[in-house]
Amino acid sequence: MTNQLPIESISVTRIAAKGGFDEHLPQETSFLFLEQFFDKSKNKIKEVILSEEGDEEQIITYSYDNDGNLISEKHHFLFDEIEENTAFKYENNLLVEKKKEFSYGSIETTVFSYNIHKLPTSIKVLDEDGIEEESEIFEYEGKNLIHFLKQNALVGKDTEIWFRYDEKNRVIEEKRWSHNDLKTLTTYYDYTNDEDEPNIKIKNDKGAVVEAHKKELNEKKQLVKHEIQTVNNGLKTFITSYEYNELGKITFLETINQSGILERSVIANYDERGLLTSEIKSEYEVAIGNINTFTLKYEYTFYQ
């Protein structure tokens, strides 16, 4: 890969394909879908513009402190003229508060607490009156392994999660209990075939498998096949296949269901620098009972 100048901006153009949700558009109709602008000094995104059929819908701007920490994020929804401003507060480079203010008056504050190892022990979401709406409580095994996580939410949707590890500190079991349905699901991770892509089985409280993930890797340790089976409302199978280029970038993927019907596919192209230049995406849309296909083209400008 050749040396690359810092990226100044990325523009994404969406080319509508005839059929699906775009059937009312001509075959070659295209519009600017997304623009990203980068801060050269911090190598981070400073502005994002989202558009729909050529009309700007949302502008997002970001600002950072001297350490590169995000300190503000502003969303401007042009159609509704609504603004959403979020301010981030840090102590010793740890995020301790995130305050989100909406132009219609609502305020939401998220506060973070940490232990002596700088790991989060609690995350709480408060409304404008300081009343807790949601929270996450973390307990650890040793210095850095999450042993227990409790997620509290309104309307009885609390969730409790326990984790178990092997001698290599890999998660081998995750038990999740939901107050919403009073059921327990246990996820088992099997690292026999690969350290980074374990096979997975999820069992209900009766010990029956309700979901399973089986993965295949090539000699380069790249994921080439991922099979998912679920038994919710009948047995369903989804098999996703992957292909890569010499840079290790995914150039093709497709997901086929148990009936052999395409659920989604992506064909990706890259330049000699490894930058994504185009994607052809196809997705099965249940609402229309048809495949919706479109192309995304990526263009870059660079700081000199």
Regions found by a protein language model. Name each.
Residues M1-Q304:
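Buried hydrophobic residues that stabilize the cores of well-folded domains
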